[in-house]
């Protein structure tokens, strides 16, 4: 497994500036950051898998060492498939740590070679989540400081179509 390749999985429904902070910081540390959009059949998404991938591609186009993927199934299996031995996760609060630690331990049980690294969110993004963006956007309020500027219109359009 390659130690310079990392995996950052998530639903990214939609990607936020908090996600981008984690991606950009990871891109400075590691040679290759693999952002993987999870197709979770148990979770109803606001944006299609294709829309989420497209928004992330737009948001990350300035980062030459970031690759975008989509997958269905277990993160540990996908990490192995693309040769990553490290998963990156962002932490906003203690509540994130509890759930992320559980997931990290479960992943380690499934693949002993897989490590999880936690990056603490920048304080200005500690409140930010995709669900907050969706709620604010659903009321037509300004989301321009919450998501990458080049996807604001994509998100607005989705809520105007409803």
From Swiss-Prot:
| A GO molecular-function descriptor | pantetheine-phosphate adenylyltransferase activity
Main location class: cytoplasm
Q: Where in the cell is it found?
A: Cytoplasm
Q: Transmembrane region positions?
A: none
Record-annotated site: Transition state stabilizer: 19
What InterPro entries does the database record attribute to this sequence? Cyt_trans-like (IPR004821), PPAT (IPR001980), Rossmann-like_a/b/a_fold (IPR014729)
Q: Which GO terms describe its biological process?
A: coenzyme A biosynthetic process
Catalysis performed (reactions): (R)-4'-phosphopantetheine + ATP + H(+) = 3'-dephospho-CoA + diphosphate
Q: Which UniProt keywords apply?
A: ATP-binding, Coenzyme A biosynthesis, Cytoplasm, Magnesium, Nucleotide-binding, Nucleotidyltransferase, Transferase
Question: What CDD domains does the database record attribute to this sequence?
Answer: PPAT
Q: Can you tell me which residues the record assigns to a coiled coil? A: none
Binding residues for substrate, per the UniProt record?
11, 43, 75, 89
Its Enzyme Commission number(s) read: 2.7.7.3
Which pathway, metabolic or otherwise, does it act in?
Answer: Cofactor biosynthesis; coenzyme A biosynthesis; CoA from (R)-pantothenate: step 4/5
A cellular component annotation (GO) from this entry: cytoplasm
- What residues bind ATP, as annotated? 11-12, 19, 90-92, 100, 125-131
Q: Name the protein family.
A: Belongs to the bacterial CoaD family.
Subunit arrangement? Answer: Homohexamer.
What is this protein's function per UniProt? Reversibly transfers an adenylyl group from ATP to 4'-phosphopantetheine, yielding dephospho-CoA (dPCoA) and pyrophosphate.
Spell out the protein name for this chain: Phosphopantetheine adenylyltransferase
């Amino acid at each position: 497994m390659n130690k310079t390749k990392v995996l950052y999985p998530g639903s990214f429904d939609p990607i936020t500036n908090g996600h981008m902070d984690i991606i950009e910081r990871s891109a400075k540390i590691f040679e290759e950051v693999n952002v993987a959009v999870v197709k979770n059949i148990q979770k109803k998404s606001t944006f299609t898998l294709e829309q989420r991938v497209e928004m992330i591609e737009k948001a990350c186009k300035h980062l030459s060492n970031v690759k975008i993927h989509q997958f269905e199934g277990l993160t540990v299996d996908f990490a192995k498939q693309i040769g990553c031995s490290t998963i990156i996760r962002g932490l906003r609060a203690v509540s994130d740590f509890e759930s992320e630690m559980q997931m990290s331990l479960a992943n380690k049980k499934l693949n002993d070679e897989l490590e999880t690294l936690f990056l603490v969110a920048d304080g200005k993004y500690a409140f930010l989540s995709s669900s907050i963006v969706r709620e604010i956007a659903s009321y037509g309020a300004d989301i321009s400081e919450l998501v990458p500027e080049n996807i604001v219109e994509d998100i607005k359009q989705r809520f105007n179509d409803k």
